[in-house]
Amino acid sequence: MSRRTIWSMLSLVVVLAMLLVACKPTPTPTPTPPPAAKPTEAPTAVPPTPVPEKKQLEIFSWWTTGGEAAGLLKLFELYNQKFPDVEIINATVAGGAGFEAKPALKARMLGGDPPDSFQVHMGHELIDTWVTTGYMEPLDDLYKQEGWEAVFPKGVLEIVSYDGHYWSVPVNIHRSNVLWYNKKVFEANGWKPPETFDEFFALAEQMKAKGITPLALGDVGIWASTHLFEVILAGTMGPEKYKGLWTGQTDWNGPEVKQALETMAKMLEYVNPDHSALSWDQANDLVIQGKAGMTIMGDWVDADNLAKGFQDSGWAPPGTKGIFIALSDTFGLPKGAPHREQAIEWLRICGSKAGQEAFNPLKGSICARNDCNPELFGPYLKTAMDDWAKDAIVPSLAHGAAASESWVTMINDVMTAFVTDKDVAKAQAGLAQACKDAGVCK
């Protein structure tokens, strides 16, 4: 091979190598990664502002009409003056003597849903229903703090006590045995209020002849008939034998009970025919309007008259002169009260002098305390104060002071039949059996 041929081949190899390099893709430079970002510190968490629990106070009662509602609202007003940040829940259930409220309360208590405090009659209704069954807190410390042992009468202290402890705070004293009448009707006819049962029946005949219903009765729920019966019982047998009915010392099969039933049967001949459809305050309206001459009911009628602007009312003991059939509204502290602290302050208001002086003139009752100013009370309540101090005090049947709630219910059942059939023998047998079933009579 010639030298020229060799150089030609070498030149060709060089050219081909150059072409291969030129055709090779240009490498993309690897980008330099950016510097790692400095981690951002999370801001310090600020805890949410806690929302304070709303302060409430639930009071359960059956005070829905006239003076009783006004008195309750006055107590609420006093409470909110001291504790303006507390919302008061007024849990009322309408129905005189708690006829509708008591079953509603029982359902709540047994279901573990107690109100903060509730209205309950002093005596067996309180003790037998709620204390012995373990649903209430004792209030001994509160009584000592407030000095109540020095201002509540001894008899009242005894009735709110059980097993050496105080269980409720009495806010008032009521009298059940009052005959209320329309003064204008009486004066226009020259009538005088009757003080004995014989005088009552003589006057009732005169009223009937004039076209006036002699006795207004509103016994929807039947308790008002039981109320009427307790007044007749006390007037027939006197204070000691009457009290003996509730201890087993007076025989329910005895002649005095029979006489009382006969008197009541006769009295029922003079009542308004629609009595079973009316409440006690609607019956009182018949007296206010002059359609009826009289009604036998507790002294809450005084508050009803005040609320309705009726000033022509008179009163007399219907065959029970010298006897004071007493009852008291109280408030207690149930175990598990949702707002216990507020409930205790409520009880302080109920037992205070200021609370009782504000409440009772409106309610138509007198103070349970013995240091209230009598000048704050109207004419009737002043006489009630005098009678409370000197009369024989006996407990009310219809309003839970004399008998247990279950016993009262049995007597109400007897009265339900009696106001319809007026069967004295059957009613007396039923009353005697009720005493046995209550465990008091043998």
Give residue ranges: language-model regions:
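Hinge/lid segment of periplasmic solute-binding proteins
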Residues: 51, 121-176, 201, 228-230, ...
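Conserved N-terminal structural module of periplasmic/extracytoplasmic solute-binding proteins
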Residues: 8, 20-133, 145-150, 193, ...
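Short, solvent-exposed loop/beta-turn-alpha elements that line the ligand-binding surface or hinge
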Residues: 137-152, 219, 236-259, 307-309, ...
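Conserved C-terminal helix/tail region of periplasmic/extracytoplasmic solute-binding proteins
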Residues: 38-39, 43-46, 187, 387, ...
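Extracytoplasmic/periplasmic solute-binding protein
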Residues: 162-171, 177, 201-249, 292
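Long, aromatic- and glycine/proline-rich binding clefts that accommodate carbohydrate-like moieties
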Residues: 157, 311, 360-413, 442
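Glycine-centered hinge/linker elements that transmit conformational signals in sensory
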Residues: 204-206, 246-277
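Extracytoplasmic/periplasmic substrate-binding proteins
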Residues: 62, 75-76, 80, 125, ...
